[in-house]
Amino acid sequence: MTKSELIERLAGLQSHLSAKTVEEAVKEMLDHMADTLADGERIEVRGFGSFSLHYRAPRTGRNPKTGDKVELEGKYVPHFKPGKELRDRVNIYTE
């Protein structure tokens, strides 16, 4: 599902809200989540999951085009850990 599909679905479920209002709300929520992570804070949505930052240590990589070794700096990357309720809902189809 893309962001525009999410907005379309939410606007359909909430007929009293315009698609523009839903779009602004979704954008604001995602911006706030990104800002929170950028500040080094963790986000927890009970039953859904949590978002945090994981540190990737510096390492030696390779340029896929030339095969040359490249030194990659350490960096933080976003990480999502699904909650139990989400894991259970997703795994309902494997039983």
UniProtKB/Swiss-Prot annotation:
Keyword Transcription appears in the UniProt entry: yes
Keywords, in A-Z order: DNA recombination, DNA-binding, Transcription, Transcription regulation, Translation regulation
Gene Ontology biological process terms, A to Z: DNA recombination; regulation of DNA-templated transcription; regulation of translation
SUPFAM superfamilies noted in UniProt: IHF-like DNA-binding proteins
Any one GO CC term of the record: chromosome
InterPro entries membership: Hist_DNA-bd, Histone-like_DNA-bd_CS, IHF-like_DNA-bd_dom_sf, IHF_beta
Molecular function in Gene Ontology: DNA binding; structural constituent of chromatin
Disulfide bonds: none
Domain of life: Bacteria
Keyword check for Transport: no
Function: This protein is one of the two subunits of integration host factor, a specific DNA-binding protein that functions in genetic recombination as well as in transcriptional and translational control.
Family: Belongs to the bacterial histone-like protein family.
Assembly notes: Heterodimer of an alpha and a beta chain.
Protein name: Integration host factor subunit beta
Name of the encoding gene: ihfB
